[in-house]
Every structure is written in structure tokens, then in C-alpha cells.
């Protein structure tokens, strides 16, 4: 893999949460390429949440380099990283983080309110934010009868679709999903993953999906078992686990 062409680049990373003496994550190198569908899995405590926080610029490493779209996130202030993330990363959270006092459409277009880059994308393509939100919700099979409703009136599966539409609007180049299928049964989970991967591919985004459930890996083009590359947890690898690739 050509490190210079990677969309996301991590080198010689060490990270510990404040108040902890020992790192929870130590990586030699990790790259994510443009358009890649990457599945990262592992048990609780192996560093998945820490890795996502680094990839999205929520936190900075204690040592090493994180580059996203050629930008060294380690050189940015917290506020600058927040702005960068709003412009370039669509995040699907485990709990969705939808605002209960906004309608479905307003929750989706909220991502554009915080992102000049997403607004500029829509402007260049002569798209209105609400029209693009409606297109995405239609693609994600959310009935039009729900678009003006509060998200509190939606089922878990419907809320997921709203969260995905919010992540995708304005075509950010990176989509990160943090265990968004944990509350779903198997059939609903597979349908959701098919929708997510299809929409990410249609928009040309790289998709990074994190889970503890290795059964989901068939939906992705590249698989990483995090304890195999995290030097902090590598000594606890179950030899029967799928080899990272």
C-alpha cells in the first residue's frame, strides 16, 4: 500500500487517555485508501474507540503523526480539528446523536450548518440542502411521511437511516461508523450494512466501520483485527482469530 497516496495516515502512534499512565493504543502504521471499505473489529478494551477518536481528530496522539487528506491533525488546535472534522468526516455514532427537538429533515441538514465544505459542495452542484436530504432519505428507504416528524417518533432502524443521511450529505470523503448496528437483529443489521456500504460507494467516500462483531466482515473490502496491530493488546490475541488483512 502506497502510504503517500493514503487518505488517512497514522505513523508511530502512542495514545493514553488523560489520567492514565499507560497507553491504550500503540500503532506502527495504518493507512486508509480513497474509496476503501475498511472493517476494524476486536473485543471491548482493545482500543477501537481510541482509534476512532484519533482518526476523527477528536483527540491528538501523545506521540506520532495523524494525517487526513494531507493535513497533519497533530498540528491543529482542538477548534480547528472540530472544523476539519465537520467538513471532511461523516460520523455515524452508536447512539446516533440525533437532536430530539428537530425534525428528520432538520437533523440531516444540520451537518451542512456546521460545514462550509459541505455547503460549497451543494452549491457547486446546484443542490439545495433540503432537496439533497430528501434524496438521501428516499435512497435510504425512509418514508416521506416521516420527514417532518421528530426523530423521537422513529424506530431504531429509522433513526439509523437519518444518521446515515446526515453523515453523507455534502459528500464528505470519509465516513466513520461506530458500532451503529449493535441494537439490531441480524436481518435488520445486514440490510442496514448493505445500505450504508452502497451509499458510501455511490458518494465515493471511504468507509471505516468499527465493531466487536466479526460476523459483519463480509460487507467490507478490507478487514483489520485491531489487537493484531495495537501493540498494547497484541499479547492477548486469540490465535484462532481472523488474520488482519
Residue ranges and their predicted role:
Residues 150-154, 158:
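Conserved ABC ATPase signature
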Residues 171:
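Conserved catalytic motifs of ABC-family nucleotide-binding domains
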Residues 72, 116, 124-145:
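Conserved ABC ATPase "signature" region
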Amino acid at each position: 500500500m502506497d502510504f503517500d497516496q493514503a487518505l488517512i495516515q497514522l505513523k508511530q502512534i502512542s495514545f493514553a487517555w488523560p489520567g492514565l499512565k499507560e497507553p491504550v493504543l500503540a500503532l506502527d502504521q495504518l493507512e486508509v485508501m480513497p474509496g476503501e471499505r475498511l472493517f476494524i473489529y476486536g473485543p471491548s478494551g482493545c482500543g477501537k474507540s481510541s482509534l476512532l477518536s484519533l482518526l476523527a481528530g477528536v483527540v491528538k496522539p501523545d506521540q506520532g503523526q495523524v494525517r487526513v487528506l494531507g493535513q497533519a491533525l497533530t498540528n491543529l488546535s482542538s477548534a480547528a480539528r472540530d472544523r476539519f472534522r465537520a467538513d471532511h468526516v461523516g460520523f455515524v455514532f452508536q447512539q446516533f446523536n440525533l437532536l430530539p427537538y428537530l425534525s428528520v429533515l432538520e437533523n440531516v441538514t444540520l451537518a451542512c450548518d456546521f460545514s462550509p465544505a459541505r455547503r460549497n459542495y451543494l452549491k457547486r452542484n446546484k443542490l439545495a440542502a433540503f432537496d439533497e436530504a430528501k434524496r438521501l432519505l428516499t435512497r435510504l428507504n425512509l418514508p416521506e411521511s416521516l420527514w417532518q416528524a421528530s426523530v423521537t417518533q422513529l424506530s431504531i432502524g429509522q433513526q439509523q437511516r437519518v444518521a446515515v443521511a446526515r453523515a453523507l450529505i455534502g459528500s464528505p470523503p470519509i465516513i466513520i461508523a461506530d458500532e451503529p448496528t449493535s441494537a439490531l437483529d441480524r436481518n435488520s443489521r445486514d440490510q442496514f450494512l448493505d445500505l450504508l456500504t452502497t451509499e458510501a460507494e455511490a458518494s465515493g467516500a471511504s468507509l471505516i466501520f468499527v465493531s466487536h462483531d466479526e460476523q459483519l466482515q463480509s460487507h467490507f473490502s478490507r478487514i483489520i483485527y485491531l489487537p493484531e496491530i495495537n501493540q498494547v493488546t497484541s499479547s492477548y490475541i486469540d490465535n484462532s482469530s481472523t488474520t488482519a488483512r
